[in-house]
């Protein structure tokens, strides 16, 4: 490709509305342009990267035995009503109508469509297992699209769906998809972790997220410093302290704390160690309970894990925090003064709180706290559960090492769905015993457009993108200095361009009438891994300057050796 016949569209300045580095660099490198909130046009450089990602995904899915299909973006509402998700999915589901006022949706996912296909196409257990995938546009009406293509409303996704007659068969395909995803992200040169995850609104019995480690990530990824254990923070178990609860050394006293409405204020004003404080959070109780609210207690320096809390049998789903009005109606005190002593509703405490002694908590009287509280002396030990987020340094749940926490960007997610959708849509086949058998399902997604942004978040420097070789838009950039004035430079540039292309190497020849500084800046910005610079001064010595983008190292290579050198670097 020649720049004179290409839309480079690079920008010198960073657009003001671009928050994260991938959004900034994708705009500056001429990869995308914003059309409307959460909607982007992909320009030639972006499309080239996108296709590289797609191709790797497609190759590994095919290698794993999955079969490619293509389903409509527009889906009839009847399928969503049949599955129950028409009401459940919420405002992210974009509902539309055709000219006959028949309701449809723009597909955010395709479980209903593929299950409908299978229930009409398959009839016998002998046809299974089967795993279908597509690479298709999705639309989710995000309330606040942000971070460019990282959280856009329209995006490209690889979604796969497998069908089975047994849990054992599902597990085999699930394991194959786990391995395929690991190969996909390894081939792309990404630093990632596969972590145990909550199944969320998709449902099912088991799931793993594939997280690209990056400081800008929205998820906390937890992993052991010595073993293979890894989990999303929502699912990571906080192990109970091994040490027995220390004996009481203080009497419980009622203390006036009129200006201490938060743990931070309490700690600062009364010089308390934060690990000797407890915070109390009130949430709605499950429907039918004899109490309207449930009190959840975690240590002052810990955070409530809302996913764990929602799974408590006493707690309403979705988890809903009580308003101040609701709290006062039950406890007769405000949110800053709550604690376990004389709490008139059910209490659940975290494992760490159960191991505390001589601690401070609200007195359930406005502007007052109890100091020196001890379990079973001042208040009976309530129900104990794991309801907090783990923190760095906690013991690993597998008993090996301690936990580290890094930020991650979710680029893939695999689920064991079970029979959730097949039961709702009555997808069954004749089993081996001759009876009708509901199908067991798995689903497996990769955010193709998000992978591009995540790769940038992991691979950039002050000059621009530093693509992993496997997904770079071009493999080699040829920069001929003063090409339009030097016949020797022009002739060599054309010769090398032809020879490299003949070797199957993707080359961008910068044949613009631009200053060298502009040419260098653009090639570094768009992140082409290998650059060769042709100039009269080096050619006097039969030399060509070669530069590797990732480490910035330069070297002079003889003109006659440059093609073989590049082929070796790229193809090994």
Curated annotation (Swiss-Prot):
- An example Gene Ontology molecular-function term: proline-tRNA ligase activity
Keywords in alphabetical order: Aminoacyl-tRNA synthetase, ATP-binding, Cytoplasm, Ligase, Nucleotide-binding, Protein biosynthesis
User: Is Ribosomal protein tagged as a keyword?
Assistant: no
Q: Does the keyword Signal apply?
A: no
The UniProt entry, under InterPro entries, shows: aa-tRNA-synt_IIb, aa-tRNA-synth_II, aa-tRNA-synth_II/BPL/LPL, Anticodon-bd, Anticodon-bd_dom_sf, Pro-tRNA-ligase_IIa, Pro-tRNA-synth_IIa_bac-type, Pro-tRNA-Synthase_IIa_type1
Q: What GO CC annotations are associated with the protein? A: cytosol
Task: Give the main location.
Answer: cytoplasm
> Where found, per UniProt?
Cytoplasm
> What EC number(s) would the UniProt record show?
6.1.1.15
Output the superkingdom of the source species: Bacteria
Q: Which GO terms describe its biological process?
A: prolyl-tRNA aminoacylation
Q: Which reaction does it catalyse?
A: tRNA(Pro) + L-proline + ATP = L-prolyl-tRNA(Pro) + AMP + diphosphate
Query: What is the recorded function of this protein according to its Swiss-Prot or TrEMBL entry?
Result: Catalyzes the attachment of proline to tRNA(Pro) in a two-step reaction: proline is first activated by ATP to form Pro-AMP and then transferred to the acceptor end of tRNA(Pro). As ProRS can inadvertently accommodate and process non-cognate amino acids such as alanine and cysteine, to avoid such errors it has two additional distinct editing activities against alanine. One activity is designated as 'pretransfer' editing and involves the tRNA(Pro)-independent hydrolysis of activated Ala-AMP.
Q: How does it assemble?
A: Homodimer.
Q: Which PANTHER family match?
A: MITOCHONDRIAL RIBOSOME PROTEIN L39/PROLYL-TRNA LIGASE FAMILY MEMBER, PROLINE--TRNA LIGASE
Q: Domain description from the entry?
A: Consists of three domains: the N-terminal catalytic domain, the editing domain and the C-terminal anticodon-binding domain.
Q: Which family does it belong to?
A: Belongs to the class-II aminoacyl-tRNA synthetase family. ProS type 1 subfamily.
Q: What is the protein name stated in its UniProt record?
A: Proline--tRNA ligase
Q: Which organism is it from?
A: Escherichia fergusonii (strain ATCC 35469 / DSM 13698 / CCUG 18766 / IAM 14443 / JCM 21226 / LMG 7866 / NBRC 102419 / NCTC 12128 / CDC 0568-73)
């Amino acid at each position: 490709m020649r720049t004179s016949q290409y839309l480079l569209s690079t920008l010198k300045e960073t657009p003001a509305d671009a928050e994260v580095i991938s959004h900034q660099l994708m705009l500056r490198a001429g990869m995308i342009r914003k059309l409307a909130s959460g909607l982007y046009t992909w320009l030639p450089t972006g499309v080239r990267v996108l296709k590289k990602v797609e191709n790797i995904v497609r190759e590994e899915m095919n290698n794993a035995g999955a079969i490619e299909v293509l389903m409509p973006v527009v889906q009839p509402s009847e399928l969503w009503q049949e599955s129950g998700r028409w009401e459940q999915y919420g405002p992210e589901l974009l509902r539309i109508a055709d000219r006959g006022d028949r309701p449809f949706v723009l597909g955010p996912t395709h479980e209903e469509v593929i299950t409908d296909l299978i229930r009409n196409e398959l009839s016998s257990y002998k046809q299974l297992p089967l795993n279908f995938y597509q690479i298709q546009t999705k639309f989710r009406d995000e309330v606040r699209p942000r971070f460019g293509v990282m959280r856009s409303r329209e995006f490209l996704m690889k979604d796969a769906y497998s069908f089975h007659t047994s849990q054992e068969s599902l597990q085999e395909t699930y394991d194959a998809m786990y391995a395929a995803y690991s190969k996909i992200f390894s081939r792309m040169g990404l630093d990632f972790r596969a972590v145990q995850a909550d199944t969320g609104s998709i449902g099912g019995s088991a799931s793993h997220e594939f997280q690209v480690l990056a400081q800008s990530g929205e998820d906390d990824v937890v992993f052991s410093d010595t073993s293979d254990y890894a989990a999303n923070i929502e699912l990571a178990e906080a192990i109970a302290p091994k040490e027995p609860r220390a004996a009481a050394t203080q009497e419980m006293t009622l203390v006036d704390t009129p200006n201490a409405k938060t743990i931070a204020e309490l700690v600062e004003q009364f010089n308390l160690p934060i690990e000797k404080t407890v915070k109390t959070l009130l949430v709605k109780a499950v429907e039918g309970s004899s109490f309207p609210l449930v009190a959840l207690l975690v240590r002052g320096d810990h955070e409530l894990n809302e996913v764990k809390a929602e799974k408590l049998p006493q707690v309403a789903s979705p988890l809903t925090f009580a308003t101040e009005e609701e709290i006062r109606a039950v406890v007769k005190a405000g949110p800053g003064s709550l604690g376990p002593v004389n709490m008139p509703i059910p209490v659940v405490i975290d494992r760490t709180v159960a191991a505390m002694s001589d601690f401070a908590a609200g007195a359930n009287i406005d502007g007052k706290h109890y100091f020196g509280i001890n379990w079973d002396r001042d208040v009976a030990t309530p129900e104990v559960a794991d309801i907090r987020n783990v923190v760095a340094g906690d013991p690993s749940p597998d008993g090996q090492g301690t936990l580290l926490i890094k930020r991650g960007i979710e680029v893939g997610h695999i689920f064991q769905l079970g029979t959730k959708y097949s039961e709702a849509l009555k997808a069954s086949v004749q089993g081996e015993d001759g009876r009708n058998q509901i199908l067991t399902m798995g689903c497996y997604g990769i955010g193709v457009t998000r992978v591009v942004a995540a790769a940038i978040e992991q691979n950039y420097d002050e000059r621009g993108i530093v693509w992993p070789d496997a997904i770079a838009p071009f493999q080699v950039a040829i920069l001929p200095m003063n090409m339009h004035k030097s016949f020797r430079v022009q002739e060599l540039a054309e010769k090398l361009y032809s020879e490299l292309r003949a070797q199957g190497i993707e080359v961008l020849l910068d044949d613009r009438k631009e200053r060298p500084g502009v040419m260098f800046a653009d090639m570094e910005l768009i992140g082409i891994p290998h650059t060769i610079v042709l100039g009269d001064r080096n050619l006097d010595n039969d030399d060509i300057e070669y530069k590797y983008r990732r480490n910035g190292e330069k070297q002079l290579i003889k003109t006659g050796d440059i093609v073989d050198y590049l082929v070796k670097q790229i193809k090994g």
